[in-house]
């Protein structure tokens, strides 16, 4: 059974961030999960016209509405990514947070933890989670149990 289309909310503004996005997409592809990544569709030049900015914004909002769930990569706290998570939460759709590199015992933001159905702290944890979800045919809710800030 399909988990539906996921919206991949993530920054990609450095080579390291870009690689992480590609790694996440590879995990989706391994599990035959359909995804939308703004990085692949709607790139905006720094000096883009107002109409181009509005077009890209509207396109991303359209895809948020069309997606069944959202994967939010919190690394480096990209502002656009956090906006997308808040918007998606208002749509009352499930959010899975991804924060590779969060050390054991580190605090995770309360607002994000409370709005998400899962927090994955590594690619292997994301892979395992999606394996279990695809096997069950549904996203599985596993509320974050670590320390919060």
Regions found by a protein language model. Give the residues of each.
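Conserved catalytic or regulatory cores that recognize and/or transform ribose-phosphate-containing ligands
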Residues: 1-149
């Amino acid at each position: 059974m399909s988990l539906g289309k996921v919206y991949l909310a993530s920054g990609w503004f450095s080579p390291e961030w870009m690689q992480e996005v590609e790694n996440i997409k590879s995990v989706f592809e391994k599990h035959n999960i359909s995804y939308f990544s703004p990085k692949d569709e709607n790139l905006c030049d720094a000096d883009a016209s107002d109409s181009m900015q509005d077009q890209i914004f509207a396109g991303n909002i359209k895809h948020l509405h069309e997606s069944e769930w959202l994967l939010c990569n919190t690394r480096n706290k990209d502002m656009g990514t956090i906006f997308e998570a808040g918007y998606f939460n208002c749509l009352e759709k499930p959010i899975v947070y991804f924060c590779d590199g969060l050390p054991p015992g580190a605090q995770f933001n309360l607002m994000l933890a409370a709005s998400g159905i899962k927090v994955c702290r590594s690619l292997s944890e994301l892979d395992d989670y999606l394996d279990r979800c695809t096997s069950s045919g549904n996203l599985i809710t596993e509320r974050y149990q670590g320390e919060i800030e």
